[in-house]
């Protein structure tokens, strides 16, 4: 028997809904929030308001693209955390209301586990390779950087994690002081592919075990950038950055 699930995600600044039938992704609709760009980061209050505006059309579109009506949904899965409290409440409240009004069971999901288990989804036109249990997963998502041992869909153990900043946070902070548009991570990734990996020397973190540390690397980058700009005020223009910089933050 095929089971059709409506998934609702609102943990940060993207409102998303998907319809899955027997591990096959039928639709996946995402509404991003451009309102945060001028602030260089996610503003929680603005994020929750945008979720309220987006969640109904996003869910409606996901159902239509999947060719499924709400009465054919067997369960509603929603993100219970981790994430921004206000954003999470929008998704949780909507999922509960939909569940009560249509008498559909609810399934709460840890969104980090959802990232890991997305490896087991298939597309309508092809089946993707699935990992065999047990396996190790490097999970890099927003405010989280972890190594997770996965023994089964419901049996996971974190064996390594960041002891300070997550990788994504370090990317975002470095992008912000360079004046890169939000989100800065993808821009840094693109610029890195065009650059010389040996051009600058940055601190290498030393952490025991399988844990990570990015705060020292971030600080090393900020000092390097400050010194480079002091030597050459046009330094940032050399790496193809045209946006106004915020170097006062690191002076």
Residue ranges and their predicted role:
Residues 78-102, 121-122:
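Short Gly/Thr/Asp-enriched flexible loops that form oxyanion-binding sites at enzyme active sites
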Residues 2, 109-135:
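Conserved phosphate-binding catalytic cores of ATP/NTP-utilizing and phosphoryl-transfer enzymes
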Residues 15-20, 137-139, 145-149:
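Short beta-strand scaffold segments in enzyme catalytic cores
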Residues 72, 94-113, 118-120:
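Nucleotide and nucleotide-moiety/phosphate-recognizing core
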Residues 5-7, 75-77, 87, 130, ...:
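Short glycine-aspartate micro-motif
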Residues 239-251:
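Single conserved hydrophobic/aromatic residue that forms the stacking wall/gate
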Residues 3, 11, 28, 131-132, ...:
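A short helix-loop
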Residues 2-82, 111, 235-238:
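N-terminal beta-alpha supersecondary unit
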């Amino acid at each position: 028997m095929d089971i059709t699930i409506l998934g609702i995600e609102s943990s940060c600044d993207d409102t998303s809904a998907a319809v899955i039938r027997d591990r096959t992704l039928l639709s996946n609709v995402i509404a991003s929030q451009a309102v945060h760009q001028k602030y260089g980061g996610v503003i929680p209050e603005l994020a929750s308001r945008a979720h309220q505006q987006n969640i109904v059309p996003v869910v409606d579109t996901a159902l239509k693209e999947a060719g499924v009506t709400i009465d054919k949904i067997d369960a509603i899965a929603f993100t219970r955390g981790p994430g921004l409290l206000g954003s999470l409440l929008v998704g949780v409240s909507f999922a509960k209301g939909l569940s009560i009004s249509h008498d559909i069971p609810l399934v709460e999901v840890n969104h980090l586990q959802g990232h890991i288990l997305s490896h087991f989804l298939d597309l309508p036109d092809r089946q993707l390779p699935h990992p065999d249990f047990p396996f190790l997963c490097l999970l890099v998502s927003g405010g989280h950087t972890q190594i997770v041992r996965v023994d089964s869909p419901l049996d996971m153990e974190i064996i390594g994690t960041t002891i300070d900043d997550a990788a994504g946070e370090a990317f975002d902070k470095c992008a912000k002081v360079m004046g890169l548009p939000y989100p800065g991570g993808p821009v840094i990734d693109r610029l890195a592919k065009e650059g010389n990996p040996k051009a600058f020397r940055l601190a290498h973190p030393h952490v025991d075990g399988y844990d990570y540390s990015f705060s020292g690397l971030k600080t090393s980058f900020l000092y390097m950038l400050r010194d480079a700009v002091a030597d050459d005020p046009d330094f940032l223009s050399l790496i193809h950055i045209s946006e106004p910089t915020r170097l006062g933050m690191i002076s």
